[in-house]
């Protein structure tokens, strides 16, 4: 019997993780994250890796574990890693949940004919809401990233800790969220080694800039998405 593949995808802040966790609990299936940046464990906050408490005991796996200095895994490599993981899991699981928002990876899957033979698909695309609703959710997420609970690291801590290694600079400058913080610091001549000390007004400005960046990225993802091919067998058609 072919493995059942649930594909949950959509833009950042649209609730993919919550949906995948709920489905994992009801189906008893593991989740494989399709987010290429989440492969970098040093970027857990900025990439939106869910915490253990958010996972509610469900199983979640990343495409690989990678240091920031090596750069974000390419879409082509991520596609092959995912193919390998699905092939391995298919021997022991009846269902798998593929969740994420990397349109580059999803488009690489769409272009790869091998996915037509991998299993039965159930597709759940989360649409981008209107700008007001999206920005409200994005602001909430960014605010939590900039002001984490006591004792927990935030995105500023991640950036400050990684910036001491020059080989990380170009990688961080190319990732949503970190990019805006770096631009802000450069414009105001704030050393990154002191970025965790910025005042509430600076954080409020960053919340708006990063939320806007997320919105623009979400629109770009919608434009770039190629569309699921008819050759992917739907579970309802099996």
UniProtKB/Swiss-Prot annotation:
GO molecular function: AMP dimethylallyltransferase activity
The UniProt record lists the keyword Metal-binding: no
Cross-referenced Gene3D superfamilies: Crystal structure of tRNA isopentenylpyrophosphate transferase (bh2366) domain, P-loop containing nucleotide triphosphate hydrolases
SUPFAM superfamilies: P-loop containing nucleoside triphosphate hydrolases
Entry keyword set: Cytokinin biosynthesis, Plasmid, Transferase
Enzyme nomenclature, EC number: 2.5.1.27
Reaction(s) this enzyme catalyzes, per UniProt: dimethylallyl diphosphate + AMP = N(6)-(dimethylallyl)adenosine 5'-phosphate + diphosphate
TM segment ranges: none
UniProt keyword annotation of Repeat present: no
Gene Ontology biological process terms in this record: cytokinin biosynthetic process
Class of this enzyme: transferase
Family: Belongs to the isopentenyl transferase family.
Function (record text): Transfers dimethylallyl groups to AMP as part of the biosynthesis of cytokinin phytohormones.
Protein name: Adenylate dimethylallyltransferase
Organism: Ralstonia nicotianae (strain ATCC BAA-1114 / GMI1000) (Ralstonia solanacearum)
């Amino acid at each position: 019997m072919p493995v059942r593949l649930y594909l949950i995808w959509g833009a950042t802040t649209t609730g993919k993780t919550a949906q995948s966790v709920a489905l994992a609990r009801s189906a008893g299936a593991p989740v494989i994250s399709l987010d290429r940046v989440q492969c970098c464990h040093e970027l857990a906050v900025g990439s939106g890796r869910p915490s253990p408490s958010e996972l509610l005991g469900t199983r979640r796996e990343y495409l690989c574990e990678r240091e920031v200095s090596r750069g974000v895994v390419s879409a082509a490599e991520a596609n092959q890693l995912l193919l390998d993981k699905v092939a391995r899991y298919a021997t022991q699981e009846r269902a798998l949940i593929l969740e994420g928002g990397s349109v580059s990876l999803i488009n690489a899957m769409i272009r790869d004919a091998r996915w037509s033979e991998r299993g039965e698909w159930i597709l759940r695309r989360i649409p981008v809401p209107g700008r007001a609703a999206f920005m409200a959710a994005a602001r909430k997420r960014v605010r939590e990233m900039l002001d984490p609970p006591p004792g927990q690291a935030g995105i500023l801590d991640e950036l400050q800790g990684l910036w001491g290694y020059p080989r990380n600079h170009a990688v961080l400058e190319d990732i949503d969220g970190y990019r805006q913080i770096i631009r802000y610091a450069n414009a105001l001549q704030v050393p990154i080694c002191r970025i965790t000390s910025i005042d509430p007004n600076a954080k409020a400005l960053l919340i708006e800039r990063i939320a806007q960046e997320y919105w623009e990225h979400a629109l770009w993802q919608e434009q770039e998405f190629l569309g699921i091919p008819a050759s992917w067998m739907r579970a309802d058609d099996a």
